[in-house]
Structure formats: C-alpha cells, structure tokens
Amino acid sequence: MEEDKRWIVVPTWRVPGRMEKWHSLVKYLKYKTKDLEKVCYVPHHKVGWAWWTCSRVIFPLKGNSHLEIQAYWNLTPEKGWLSSYSVRITWYTEKFWTDVTPDCADVLIHSTYFPCFTAGEVRRAIRGEKLLSCCNYPRAHRAQVPSLQFLALVVVQQNDRPQRDSTTRKQRRRDYRRGLRLAKQDSRSHKQRSSESPTPRTYFPGVAEVLEILA
C-alpha cells in the first residue's frame, strides 16, 4: 500500500529574485569587515539531506538564543516554479522557538551586532560636542517607538556633522557595493591578515531590504 505524501507547512517570506545579494553581503560582513564574525553561514552543499534548503544563516544572540534565516529554493516544482525563493526567519531560545517577522529579526540582530549610540552621546549633544558613535543599523529602530533622546541624536548625526556624515555615507555605499560584488566573483576563500588595519564598521540596510522580501 502506497503511503500518502505528508506535507509540512511553515510560514515563509517570498523573495522575488535570487539569493546572491543576501549570501554575498553575509560573507562580506563575516569574513572581510568581521561585523558578523560569529555568524554561521551554511551553504546549500553543506546543509545535508534538506535538498530544498538553499542556505542557512545562524546569528548567535545574547542569552543563549539564536536567530536563523533559512532560504528555500525549488519551490512547487510540479508547477515549474524552480526559480522561486523564500526565507523562513526563526528565533530559538532554550525553552521555545517561534517564527518572527523581518522587522523583529532586525531588532534581534541589532541587539548583538552593529554598534549604536552609546549612553554618553546625549550629554555630548547637549554640550554641543561632536558625537563619538552612531547607529549603523537604523532599520532596526523602525519597529520600535523611538525615545526623544534617540530622535535628537539622529537629528544631530544628520545635521551637526555634514562633512563627517558625508564621508560616512560614502563609506557605507562603498562597503555595500563591495559586498554585493562578491556574488559575481564567486569567492569562496577569504584571507585574514593581522597586519592590515581594521575595516570601519559597516552600515546594514536591514533584512527585508537586502532580501527584497514580498510581504
């Protein structure tokens, strides 16, 4: 007797294009800038038996928890949609796990990765001094109710330091473009040189923007 086919239904977010942009940016931030050095990137040929999985990116978080972004491909092959992609975003803790939205994923990632304003920046802004830190993950704050202190720091960062801010934005654009070009180069080996000067912190545009997720 032939066994009926069993289906496992999970919530996913559809991605309109291919996954090279996401993979290249993760590898660039992991191996080059070291912003995501602790992140585990698992390509499709190392996933194992899960042939429908394109990649797995695991973000270790604080408090013995982690966030996993798992990309799927070869969706609905019976309809010929072999070029369709989607991602599943899951948050794991010691006692439970749950699927989360891209906005929630941004908040979780920013809690561990990419620097933000330090506690002393408010006092520096009140005294009219230059800010010594900035937020490199502004997308993570869109899902939250911002405090007056945070809004004030954003305004100071944008208006009070035009020359430095312009340089920072140019550096962010260069870092982002370099990360995206890694997909075309298909570079799988990354050399780590201790004699090189540390690379400046990289701006991260957000999970939904990089993946171009269709809500």
Swiss-Prot record:
Induction entry: Expressed late during infection in a Rev-dependent manner.
KW Transport (keyword) present: no
Signal sequence, renumbered to the chain: none
Keywords: AIDS, Host cell membrane, Host cytoplasm, Host membrane, Host-virus interaction, Membrane, Phosphoprotein, Ubl conjugation, Ubl conjugation pathway, Virion
Main localization (coarse): host cell
InterPro entries linked to this entry: Vif
Motif (HCCH motif): 110-141
Mod. after translation: Processed in virion by the viral protease. Highly phosphorylated on serine and threonine residues.
Region of interest: Multimerization: 154-167
Extent of motif BC-box-like motif: 147-156
Keyword Ubl conjugation attached: yes
TM region(s), chain numbering: none
UniProt-annotated location(s): Host cytoplasm; Host cell membrane; Virion
Positions bearing Phosphothreonine: T98
GO cellular component: host cell cytoplasm; host cell plasma membrane; membrane; virion component
Membrane topology recorded in Swiss-Prot or TrEMBL: Peripheral membrane protein
Top-rank lineage group of the source organism: Viruses
Modified sites of kind Phosphoserine: S147
Residue ranges, compositional bias (Basic residues): 169-181
Sequence segments annotated as region (Disordered): 161-203
Family in the record: Belongs to the primate lentivirus group Vif protein family.
Subunit organization: Homomultimer; in vitro and presumably in vivo. Interacts with viral Pr55Gag precursor and human APOBEC3G. The interaction between Vif and APOBEC3G is species-specific, which may play a role in restricting the replication of HIV to humans. Forms an E3 ligase complex by interacting with human CUL5 and elongin BC complex (ELOB and ELOC).
Note: Required for replication in 'nonpermissive' cells, including primary T-cells, macrophages and certain T-cell lines, but is dispensable for replication in 'permissive' cell lines, such as 293T cells. In nonpermissive cells, Vif-defective viruses can produce virions, but they fail to complete reverse transcription and cannot successfully infect new cells. Vif-defective viruses show catastrophic failure in reverse transcription due to APOBEC-induced mutations that initiate a DNA base repair pathway and compromise the structural integrity of the ssDNA. In the absence of Vif, the virion is morphologically abnormal.
Role summary: Counteracts the innate antiviral activity of APOBEC3G. Forms a complex with host APOBEC3G thus preventing the entry of this lethally hypermutating enzyme into progeny virions. Functions as an adapter molecule, recruiting APOBEC3G to the ubiquitin-proteasome machinery. Targets APOBEC3G for degradation through the assembly with elongin BC complex, CUL5 and RBX1. Binds viral RNA and affects the stability of viral nucleoprotein core. May play a role in viral morphology.
This protein's domain notes: The BC-like-box motif mediates the interaction with elongin BC complex. The HCCH motif (H-x(5)-C-x(18)-C-x(5)-H) mediates the interaction with CUL5.
Protein's recorded name: Virion infectivity factor
Lineage: Viruses, Riboviria, Pararnavirae, Artverviricota, Revtraviricetes
